């Protein structure tokens, strides 16, 4: 979205959902991965919104929601959510979006001046003519093959879109973990721009992140490609010249450790070897380092996969009281809709020897850098207000940070496209993009696999062996497969298979002895649990333009497991 809108964050707020006429949910399972969103969807539904779910799996949280905070949710049937469910084939989202946009443009041609938002397009957008010309060549049969949908289903979605004055399209990792994730998201922007669905209440693109503070990390500079203006602000604030060359993301870091160009790993939280793709390659890469350091709030698999020397540094979690020289501290979080709020621990730490992450990082910096840079590391540790004061001088939107964060509800960061219909792109306008439709070719007898989370799971942390919404008990080594595919492959529900991924590098990656579960997933598509299925995803299989592991489009073959 940064290329098309100038800002790579959600252009809606939490309250916008209740103002929308139509909400399209793509590649997302809010019931398991983003439960707070269910309340927003329920409020939208009660306010009259129509909801369309686009997903290979008919997830419970997309269909109905029983809100435990309402009487109806406790003893009634709950709230029906999706008015239309499009059971799309994996990696078919880009084709669907282009097909809907083409229908919108065709409707405008049939009824000139009545479908598109011409005033918005003329004032705020560029590239419509090129986009329109490109879609003239879109082949309907190609679309239907890529999506697994019927033309009538796409027609219905297009009609819903054209009837709605305010439209939100929201998505999660079901879209971002494909090779063509970046152009797919650009197609979301294209569709929204056609009818001016950006920069007005109840409308806009809404990416939902996979972790509670991943967006806040990026805002604070945790990115390998921070822009020069951010680095300039750091230099001005702290009096040193930060590196100007690009760094490495997680996939690039694993490659570097594998190849020996990276010799030290310092992991601030996380469970790298279990979260990243190509598990065996990742484990070998970390073991190839001279030193691995894990700064962690709890033990995980990565602590058993270490370099030649290893340190595990326990750290306070944000549920624990963090006492420093100036008193009890709090930290801050930026959520997926740009809202910033404080988080303060209430639990006594298990030991007074456990340090906060801020303490560990600042003490490391002081020990390594000393007086080489003019930074008051001790001041940072003693009072997090000092950290926030510096942030307020460096990061746009955080001016007067210490005052605003103490407001009861925190504050929402400014967003030029959302707030003012201003687009900080090189042209000053929102940009339509032209994206070539490229679908996955699946050989006969092969399937497309995606990795998914279970309900009792948060990222790589699993709390039970059950998945209540999908009816799975006492096990995670399972493969969800459609009844049609079971029949075509002459396999039986409850049988066991070895899953082999087929990649251009010719490496035989295999996940053995998965129990088959007949499930109403899209034909030709199967699903296995993350992180177990990471062993099947090649490290070099990533989204073009973002380098995100393509964990939702893995071509696999199934072979019966030996008894």
Task: Show the residue positions of the predicted features.
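Segments of small-molecule ligand-sensing domains
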Residues: 398-412
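Intrinsically disordered/low-complexity terminal segments and short unstructured peptides
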Residues: 169, 260, 402, 424-426
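Short acidic, Pro/Gly- and aromatic-enriched capping/linker segments at domain boundaries
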Residues: 412-420
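Non-catalytic alpha/beta scaffold blocks inside enzyme catalytic domains
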Residues: 2-201, 207-390, 445-448, 452-563
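Segments forming glycine/polar-rich beta-alpha architectures that bind adenosine-containing cofactors
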Residues: 422-424, 430-431
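A short N-terminal beta-strand-loop micro-motif at the entrance of redox/enzyme domains
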Residues: 435-440
